[in-house]
Curated annotation (Swiss-Prot):
One of its GO terms (molecular function) is iron ion binding. It catalyses: N(6),N(6)-dimethyl-L-lysyl(36)-[histone H3] + 2 2-oxoglutarate + 2 O2 = L-lysyl(36)-[histone H3] + 2 formaldehyde + 2 succinate + 2 CO2. It comes from Brugia malayi (Filarial nematode worm). It is found in: Nucleus. Keywords: Chromatin regulator, Dioxygenase, Iron, Metal-binding, Nucleus, Oxidoreductase, Repressor, Transcription, Transcription regulation. One of its GO terms (biological process) is negative regulation of DNA-templated transcription. This is Bifunctional lysine-specific demethylase and histidyl-hydroxylase NO66. Residues 103-137 are annotated as: Disordered. Residues 109-132 have a biased composition (Basic residues). Residues 359-506 form the JmjC domain. It comes from the Eukaryota.
Amino acid sequence: MIKGKRSFPKRQNNVRVLNSSRVEEFDISDHNQSIDSINELSAYEVLSLRKKTEDGIKSNLNEERVASSLTSRAEDNKPCRDFVKSDRNVLASDFLSKYGEETDEMNKTKKKQKKIMKKEIRKRTKRKRKSVNKRELSGSIKTWIPTHSGSSVFSSLFRNCDDSKEMXDSIVDCLSEGEEIEEIKIVNLSDSSHGSSFESDEINEDKNMVDEEENDEELIDERSTNSAVRENFVRCYGKEKDEDASDVVIDFEQKPFSTHCDSVQNGLDAIQWLIDPYDLTQFFKMVFQKKVFLVCHNNPNYYGNLFSTAKFIDILQTDYVEYGTNVNVAIYKNQQRSTLNGSGKVYPQAIQKSIKAGCSIQLTNPQSFCDNVWYYCDLLQEVFGCFVGANIYITPANTAGFAPHWDDIDAFLLQLEGRKHWKIYAPDSDDEMLPRLPSGNFTDNDVINRMLVFDDWLEQGDMLYIPRGYIHQGFADKDVHSLHLTVSVCRNVTYADLLERVIPPALSNFAEQNVNIRKSLPARYLDMTGVLECDYPLLKTGTMKLHRFLDSIFSNFCKYIKELSEPAVDMMAREFMRTALPPVLTKEEKDMTALCVAGSSLYGDKEHIFTKNTSIKLLRRHGQRLIYESEERCFIVHRMANSRVYEGRPEVLFDLDVELAEGFANLVNAYPRWCLVSDLKCNDAADNIRLAELLYSNGLLMAEFREAMK
């Protein structure tokens, strides 16, 4: 075995391929992936050119098509074990000899037609690339209804089509006779790039055209193998926008997602905005933790003022940012990643020198310094129920800062500046899927035999989702730097983490309640069995008794564990409250919490007084959790006073009298609606007010005081 090379078991691919053959018909640059997608012909131009080409040779092919049609009908009633047919009735050339001269003639005719069309398309591609208007390239691509489906469209489907009906009619015209017409949908199972070059090369394009003419059968075989790639990758495009609306830039300082009274709904809106126009329900059902997912928003300003290089410089100038703790400086050369951190405070000029030397910069916790990133991470915490962190990566032009690796988190990559080329590889086996720990650094030899599911550019304004366990590596463009924000979710919130928290205490309690499990092991148990294969004196009789006893214990213990699902979730919730970011409050929310000042002056004598008619509401749905320590004691743990640095402060909690627990439950049930203090329905009115005051003083509650409103 070559030193440094890692061996991995091959993955058994049993995931359904979603109509991958539909992608291939209009693919005109399989061997020339270095051509930027913005220089491709639009779908409308391809379809129009195809139609004209077909019309020019249709009369010459009429007799051959009639004969082939009769032949195909006669063959329909025969078994076709080896007969391969694509969605558009293109026959695979490897099997033609089995089906007579008529079928062979038909395929040759179609090949001639296809070659003529490719030549015309390539000539037109060159003309378009020379005359392309850069101003038009910044425009948004027009889209259609967001529906997850197996139907496929290639990258420039609706670029220059101003009339959606015209485009739909063009697609219908190109469908074969008798083929079922499907609704146009948004999902594109993208083709994976084959080349490693990121620059356009017109000379290679001409060479590829000749190669394709000579090796057309090889193209078909290559595409059939690529179909397995598409099961792990989904791509969709941004919605069509009016010219006036396209100039609107999101402003995170205005808390744009804090529009609902329910904090979970606000979080869902934030995720929907990130993956727009893809459907949120379909994302969690079909994509999340299953596939790499790319959204081309086609809007360089899509992320507004979320973060920028200017903001990073401002952080370095105004905050105490330290090497190792907040910033890492790394360089990747000769398949090795080296960390070149300094010591102490990070200064802008030092970062400037590092970037000039080809080093990448990682800001490990931008949410601690940038309110906009903090705000967005907090929104997602309400949905995922875990700490949501972020990283900023600045990569100089023509460099790669980090080695190939996988993460122990699900990552949303937001390309804020420049562009970056990503290569992503699927896990080789189920053992590598959804890992709980990050990997080490891989080399090119480690990934050479892995399934490449994504090999493409992430443009400014785009979003790329990478599930846990997918090896990935990024390269900046040769002419421009890259700055992207990685939002990390779902770290340490697996079922395994839940069981790790519940099984040890559950086993202890189970032993206290079950006398049989407290019995000593039988005499001479050492002679019953062991891992070493040898003649144990009591192997037959002793092992049988031991297994029978353990089977009974395990069966009862599993039943006991199932009854602990409720406290197990509470334990996970407690961990979330301990590690999560504190909530970001709007001005209106601050004015209705303990953060506001009663009256107009800190030195005034006004005081907020709770009455039975005071309107109250929890500040967040998942800002707090009531935990029962025993039947006689409970407490509330919350994240309202947490640090913006991960685990920067100890856990914050306070005791709650058990008799007030029902009132707290009524308050939780009322969310997201407002309710009166009297609606808490504790034992008496005094307990209602006592509970409201306790929650309010700890920052969990919003209240509307009539005197203050007046």
